[in-house]
């Protein structure tokens, strides 16, 4: 697989009629003197820019965040700081080569800079999310590399990684073991993956396979028990499987705001019983695990 050829082809996506005007707006922002704070809210401070809120709203929906840009608070659908803070005590990225698979607009990558990693690379084949990233990075001026690539390109990438984050991606794959193998192949020796996915309670090595959708999401294929997830990971070649955290998704973490379009968590759950999805399945819960490659 020729990664450079794929890069060239996908760069053309930035000329799509819904993306090109956004790119032009960003290019005309000019150079601005500002300061950056990488806390729960990724904050950019400085002399207010004209029409900055209008510019940011052109890039809706904002799924991950929050950000504050010259006084404009981008109240994203997900309060991504909650997940980041939950995981924060479980990793140290200093001098490590780090990838974030399905990085969206780069919120986690911006936060990870505080660890002084050797390399930060985001993978996400979404021109809109890359445009959001470029908008924020116009002011942050980070060295983060954003690739319009997916997990299937990871094993062919120029670098192998010490730590790969894969948060909220696995359940979108119809062949989860194949995806886990791709993550494995993207690691350097003794590398680690920090992964989260939906799970169901139970000791059996089984999974829920939704008929047509789960929590109104059509491309959810398998929701395993933790035991079944462990088996997938071992089959993919990982030498260890460590549960870090579990959590029930709440409306404090995911909710409607004026920065998204359409529905959010409250619309995905049964109106009379919020422990169930509208389809009658268990409400979304996540398990966070660390997988290690080990030496073979």
Swiss-Prot record:
Molecular function in Gene Ontology: transferase activity, transferring alkyl or aryl (other than methyl) groups
Catalyzed reactions per annotation: carboxy-S-adenosyl-L-methionine + 5-hydroxyuridine(34) in tRNA = 5-carboxymethoxyuridine(34) in tRNA + S-adenosyl-L-homocysteine + H(+)
Binding site for carboxy-S-adenosyl-L-methionine: 64, 78, 83, 102, 124-126, 151-152, 171, 286
GO biological process: tRNA wobble uridine modification
Key words, A-Z: Transferase, tRNA processing
InterPro entries: CmoB (IPR010017), Mo5U34_MeTrfas-like (IPR027555), SAM-dependent_MTases_sf (IPR029063)
EC id: 2.5.1.-
SUPFAM superfamilies: S-adenosyl-L-methionine-dependent methyltransferases
Record text on subunit structure and interactions: Homotetramer.
Family assignment from sequence similarity: Belongs to the class I-like SAM-binding methyltransferase superfamily. CmoB family.
Function: Catalyzes carboxymethyl transfer from carboxy-S-adenosyl-L-methionine (Cx-SAM) to 5-hydroxyuridine (ho5U) to form 5-carboxymethoxyuridine (cmo5U) at position 34 in tRNAs.
Protein name as catalogued: tRNA U34 carboxymethyltransferase
Source organism of this protein record: Sulfurimonas denitrificans (strain ATCC 33889 / DSM 1251)
Gene for this chain: cmoB
């Amino acid at each position: 697989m020729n990664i450079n050829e794929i890069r060239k082809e996908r760069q053309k996506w930035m000329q799509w009629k819904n993306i090109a005007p956004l790119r032009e707006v960003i290019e005309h922002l000019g150079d601005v003197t500002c300061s950056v704070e990488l806390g729960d809210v990724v904050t950019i401070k400085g002399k207010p820019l004209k029409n900055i809120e209008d510019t940011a709203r052109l890039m809706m929906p904002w799924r991950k965040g929050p950000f504050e840009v010259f006084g404009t608070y981008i109240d994203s659908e997900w309060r991504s700081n909650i997940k980041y803070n939950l995981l924060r005590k479980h990793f140290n990225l200093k001098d490590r080569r780090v990838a974030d698979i399905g990085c969206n607009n780069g919120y986690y990558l911006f936060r990870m800079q505080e660890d002084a990693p050797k390399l930060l690379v985001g993978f996400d084949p979404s021109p809109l999310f890359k445009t959001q990233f470029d908008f924020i990075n116009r002011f942050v001026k980070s060295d983060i590399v954003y690739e319009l690539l997916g997990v299937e390109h990871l094993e062919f990438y120029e670098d192998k990684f010490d730590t790969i984050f894969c948060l909220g991606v696995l359940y979108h794959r119809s062949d989860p073991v194949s995806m886990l193998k791709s993550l494995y192949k993207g690691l350097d020796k003794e590398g680690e993956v920090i992964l989260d996915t939906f799970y169901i309670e139970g000791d059996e090595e089984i999974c829920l396979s939704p008929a047509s959708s789960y929590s109104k999401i059509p491309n959810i294929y398998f929701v395993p028990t933790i035991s079944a997830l462990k088996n997938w990971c071992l089959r993919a070649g990982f030498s260890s499987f460590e549960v870090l955290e579990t959590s029930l998704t709440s409306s404090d973490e995911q909710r409607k705001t004026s920065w998204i379009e359409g529905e959010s968590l409250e619309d995905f759950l049964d109106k009379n019983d919020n422990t169930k999805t509208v389809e009658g399945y268990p409400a979304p819960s996540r398990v966070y695990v660390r997988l290690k490659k080990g030496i073979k």
